[in-house]
Regions:
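Active-site-proximal N-terminal segment of extracellular/periplasmic enzymes that hydrolyze or transfer
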Residues: 2-5, 9-12, 17-65
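His/Asp/Glu-rich, glycine-adjacent segments
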Residues: 3-4, 9, 17-23, 85-233, ...
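Beta-strand elements within well-structured catalytic alpha/beta cores of enzymes
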Residues: 30-46, 57, 81, 124, ...
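Secreted, luminal/periplasmic, and some membrane-associated catalytic domains
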Residues: 31-33, 72-73, 97-113, 117-118, ...
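Glycine-/proline-rich flexible loop or hinge segments
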Residues: 35-40, 59-65, 73-78, 95-109, ...
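Short, structured active-site-proximal loop/turn typified by the sulfatase FGly-forming signature C/S-X-P-X-R
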Residues: 46-89, 132-134
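Short glycine/proline-rich, acidic loop/turn segments that cap or connect secondary-structure elements
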Residues: 441-460
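C-terminal helical/tail subdomains of lipid-metabolizing enzymes
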Residues: 467-477
Length: 487
């Protein structure tokens, strides 16, 4: 039998049972910190004094010398930044190389599948599914698993005409950018007319994409310093003015990033140093009987498939392809005494410099600090191919910085250029044959490992204490993941 309640004991109010606060849904993830990564080509500590906006960013944030790779050229360095791997692993051994299976030298390819390794965006998406990436003019953009792509892509008409344009993903972005900014200024991106116009267009495109798409990671390539520093050298007043002009053009983009709370990283692939000695490496191989040409209509063309040895010149680096092992000694003998060559790497040397990849030449030549390699292989300018006097980055079997100049020895060069431009505007075929065959005007180059940090690349971050005393090129990927909150 249950006893009745004792009336002398007052009722105790019921204690409400606390309902636990709902746990955050594990599938709801905090957004990564948005990043803007500016590839300011040719930026060095010395140039920073002429770039007040970037310098303030470095002073309020953090900065450090940035190690580079061999070769210190655009495609190899960018591929290392985005994969965290050396050229021996990702396979980008220069801005181009000899495709042995095709028997052809090809530079400035665009398919991202050429780059091996785990890309930055793949690592980011494993940590944060749905991570979005915009690539505005970094190389190997086509076919990459990025959400937004803008990259130079001329229109090649069937009659041989070439008009400026760009490639975008999604495709509708092409007309959107063209309507807002005008046609991509290809002839201001490279060639005798290369100037600030191209970098301004890229900056404006980047601002538009950030404002309308808000990608988690935005990669932006700014080439302006590449032009006058190669034309005139890094210490010339015109080069210092180019640095100041680019800095002023970047200011609105930096302001946009700050207003959005976007972390900014500005880095460079290499520093450009003063040079005065062109080295005709292919002419030396030809005189030694190792390089072969074939002739059509009086013009000589490199015959890489028949040559016992030839070089793919790429600024201060040249991959030397030797068809048979028994020709290695003769090739070395032809190059060992050539003025302007600092080192000739074979298997062990390539391994030491992380260049031991099947795409590399059997030998790799490194120029002395004040020298650089031409691609020229003809011995008489009367037999040069007609493309030698044109801006033809896809036909020349090596890099040609002389394309930045109009021929100073041709009194009619401006008339020729104007005539070609008039024919172009009328929709007629034209040849802009204005490029000199004299390499001596070039005053700046890159490709070697720099002699000092002052001459080398730099990394700046808007976040204080984000970097230590030095950053390796292979550490850029992990740094960006950490800055995004994904490392």
């Amino acid at each position: 039998m249950t006893e009745p309640p004792d009336p002398t004991i007052s009722a105790v109010p019921a204690v409400p049972v606390e309902t636990p606060a709902p746990r955050p849904d594990a599938t709801v993830m905090r957004r990564p910190t948005p990043l803007l990564v500016l590839d300011v080509v040719g930026l060095t500590p010395r140039l920073l004094d002429h770039m007040p906006h970037l310098k303030r960013l470095a002073q309020s944030g953090s900065h450090a010398p940035l190690g580079t790779v061999l070769p210190a050229v655009t495609c190899a360095a960018q591929s290392t930044f985005l994969t965290g791997a050396h050229p021996s692993e990702h396979g980008i051994v220069g801005n181009g190389w000899y495709f042995r299976d095709l028997g052809d030298v090809l530079l400035w390819r665009q398919h991202n599948r050429l780059v091996a390794g785990d890309k930055l965006w793949d690592a980011a998406r494993r940590a944060h599914p749905g991570y979005t990436v915009a690539n505005i003019c970094w190389w190997y953009a086509m076919g990459a698993d990025t959400d937004i792509t803008v990259t130079p892509r001329p229109i090649y008409y069937s009659d041989g005409r070439k008009d400026p344009d760009c490639y975008t993903r999604p495709p509708a972005l092409h007309d959107e950018l063209t309507a807002k900014l005008g046609t991509f200024p290809l002839f201001h991106f490279w060639g005798p007319g290369a100037d600030l116009v191209s970098s301004r267009w890229i900056i404006d495109a980047t601002r538009h994409i950030i404002r309308t798409r808000h990608p988690d990671l935005t990669l932006c390539y700014l080439p302006h310093l590449d032009y006058d520093l190669q034309r005139f050298g890094p210490d010339d007043p015109r080069s210092l003015k180019a640095a100041a002009d680019l800095d002023a053009a970047m200011a609105p983009l930096l302001d946009d990033a700050r207003a959005e709370g976007r972390t900014v990283v500005a880095l460079s692939e290499y520093g450009i140093t003063r040079v005065s000695r062109p080295v005709d490496i292919n002419r030396a191989l030809r005189r030694a009987g190792l390089l072969e040409v074939h002739t059509q209509d009086g013009m000589e063309y490199l015959d890489p498939m028949a040559s016992r040895a030839f070089a793919v010149a790429d600024h201060q680096i040249a991959h030397v392809y030797v068809r048979r092992p028994e020709d290695l000694d003769a090739t070395r003998a032809a190059l060992d005494g050539l003025p302007g060559i600092d080192q000739l790497l074979h298997d062990e040397g390539k391994k030491d410099h992380h260049l031991d990849h099947p795409r590399s030449g059997e030998l790799v030549a490194i120029a002395e600090p004040d020298a650089w390699f031409t691609y020229y292989y003809w011995l008489d300018d009367a037999h040069a191919p007609d493309f030698a006097r044109l801006v033809e980055i896809h036909r020349k079997p090596g890099y040609d910085p002389v394309e930045l100049f109009m021929d100073p020895l041709d009194p009619y060069v401006k008339v020729k250029a104007a005539t070609a431009l008039a024919r172009k505007k009328l929709g007629m075929r034209y040849r802009m044959a204005v490029v000199p065959l004299d390499p001596s005007p070039i005053r700046g180059s890159h490709g070697r490992i720099p002699e000092s940090d002052d001459e080398g690349p730099l990394l700046i971050c808007s976040t204080p204490r984000a970097v230590g005393d030095r950053v390796a090129a292979t550490d850029v990927k992990s740094l960006l993941l950490r800055l995004a909150g994904l490392g």
